[in-house]
From Swiss-Prot:
GO terms for cellular component: cell surface; extracellular region. This is Cryptic family protein 1B. GO terms for molecular function: activin receptor binding; nodal binding. InterPro entries: Cryptic/Cripto_CFC-dom, EGF-like_dom. Disulfide bonds join C90-C97, C91-C103, C105-C114. Gene3D superfamilies: Laminin (2.10.25.10). Glycans are attached at N52. It comes from Homo sapiens (Human). It comes from the Eukaryota. It is found in: Secreted. Belongs to the EGF-CFC (Cripto-1/FRL1/Cryptic) family. Its main location: secreted. Residues 1-25 form the signal peptide. Keywords: Developmental protein, Disulfide bond, EGF-like domain, Gastrulation, Glycoprotein, Secreted, Signal.
Length: 223
């Protein structure tokens, strides 16, 4: 075997190895590209699924909520399944239930469930949240209904007495001012030129009790 045969053999082996290497790299690139495409498709589907559910089922949820009657239960409970106890309709008087959590009330109706009719108000000219005095009770207007506190003046039923009781309340604030005046008066007595030397003599004489006999009136007892 001549040297030419050896060269041809080496050339053939190297060419075969290069072809095998190119084939393996092509297979790896193809496999990685397929995995990336699958991942992208799965990600796009995952992102689109909540949006599709929201757009397609929002009308169904709101429409089914509008169709419930005042005495009809919900078809099923979202939290506990079919075996849970049914709850009544969330909105009244033609209100629209949005996502099962709050109501959009029509005109002249208010409240959490549109249960209060503003045209049938017990408050008269009072607005929502206003206070008034009615039959010796302090009342507040809440959604067209009066809610009264217990009786404020048990023995008197005159609004003037009720107002007077509140007017005399702040007078108790004058007690601290009187307590501040007492040290000032004592200090003034001490600074006077004719002030006594002993502090016990500062006590007014009106506070000293006189000694009197404890016997019956008309009978004189000597001390």
């Amino acid at each position: 075997m001549t040297w030419r045969h050896h060269v041809r053999l080496l050339f053939t082996v190297s060419l075969a190895l290069q072809i095998i290497n190119l084939g393996n790299s092509y297979q790896r690139e193809k496999h990685n590209g397929g995995r990336e495409e699958v991942t992208k498709v799965a990600t796009q589907k995952h992102r689109q699924s909540p949006l599709n559910w929201t757009s397609s089922h929002f009308g169904e949820v709101t429409g089914s909520a509008e169709g419930w009657g005042p005495e009809e239960p919900l078809p099923y409970s979202w939290a506990f399944g079919e075996g849970a106890s049914a709850r009544p309709r969330c909105c009244r008087n033609g209100g629209t239930c949005v996502l099962g959590s709050f109501c959009v009330c029509p005109a002249h109706f208010t409240g959490r469930y549109c249960e209060h009719d503003q045209r049938r108000s017990e408050c008269g000219a009072l607005e929502h949240g206003a206070w008034t005095l009615r039959a010796c009770h302090l009342c507040r207007c809440i959604f067209g209904a009066l809610h009264c506190l217990p009786l404020q003046t048990p023995d008197r039923c005159d609004p003037k007495d009720f107002l007077a009781s509140h007017a005399h309340g702040p007078s108790a604030g004058g007690a601290p001012s009187l307590l501040l005046l007492l040290p000032c008066a004592l200090l003034h007595r001490l600074l006077r030129p004719d002030a006594p030397a002993h502090p016990r003599s500062l006590v007014p004489s009106v506070l000293q009790r006189e000694r009197r006999p404890c016997g019956r009136p008309g009978l004189g007892h000597r001390l």
